[in-house]
Amino acid sequence: MIDSKKLIEELKERGLMSSLSGDLYEVFSKPTTFYVGTDPTGDSLHVGHLLAFTTAKLLQKYGHRPIVLVGGFTAKIGDPSFRDTSRPLITDEQVLHNSECIKAQVSKLIDFNSDTENKAIMLNNDEWMGKMNLSDYMKNVAKLTTVNYMMAKESVKKRLNREGEGISLCEFLYMTAQGYDFLHLYKEYGCRCEIGGQDQYGNCTIGLEFIRKALGKSDACALTWPLVTRADGTKFGKSSNGKNIWLSAEKTSPFEFYQFWVNQSDEDSEAFIKKFTLIPLDEIEQMIAKHRENPSARYLQKELAKYMTCLVHSEEEYNKAIEATDILFGKGTTEQLATIDESSLLAAMDGVAKVEVSRDMFTSGTSVIDLANMHDKVPSKSEARKLIKSNGFSINKEKVTNEKDVVDASKLIQGKYLLLQKGRKDYTLVIAK
């Protein structure tokens, strides 16, 4: 037997429970198979997807078996849930490629490889939905629901009520495909629970309806978690300049990923370390208490960023991110700056001014006065001279003390970058092409 009461209390304390249908206490009182869906329309997940797999990992820790269901078939339809417009459709080849990429990422979050009975499996709903013809659909799926039931769903009503929009029949039928997924997994894999975000609650419950009508069973359940927002009401999952934070190192560097977490507010860090990590709750309370003693040290943010970066990338990438942070924003030296990889440098400089110049100007050398004048906050050469005389200007972390100095190509980081620094925090990145 599994202590389902303890599990559900932990879900609540971590903020991982929003809506519930069915008897969750009974379903999770013994080892149970559950499923979580993922969308293969892209080749990488982003941080907005992490909560699904945090929840799945927690359930797996208690002895339950996860099915990660790739929506290969439904991706070719488009989910209308709380979207203002339809999704673009994708090809079978794209679905296959994206599914492989997603599995590689998810494998870091939940266990697919152990010898335990509850190791995760990954399935693609195209395996059963893709084989179904119209006659099969009418007999096996369409008869299990009514138009009235579907019209009452909030996601459908929102699209229908938007002037000039409407909803295609293809998208309208999406929820029946998701409902049939639950029915199929219930019959073939003994799956008794679907988990998802709050915006998926309507689609989750139609699966329960299908199981009840097709099999006369009412022992399945659905569990959803609240949508994640920041304390200030802004959307979670994007950087300060509005970019998605991806799990793929090619799309978002580990340095930028680390910075995303370490820059969270105190209030958000307290919530996110409960939601996104499996650090025991009593330890988290101790960490929060320690953080509150000296919030300016950002202890909690650093611990959250460490956990998430090690989880999604690796301890090695975490150490590189820490080193890059110390070099760029701490007391790094010119020699240390030269060791930073290009992706970390560009990620760190993402929000600063950039100046593109010809590499030829460094062949015979460029004066430090001219370089200082390239800085975003140095409007003239006279200001550049004053800045240098006051020891307020650095190139590649090295103070410039002689206004007659010149800089040649040997000083370029990675053969093409110069980091201009005014004071302690004002940077401009020179890119030589």
Segments predicted by a language model, with ranges:
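NTP-dependent nucleotidyl-transfer catalytic core
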Residues: 1-200, 205-208, 215-221
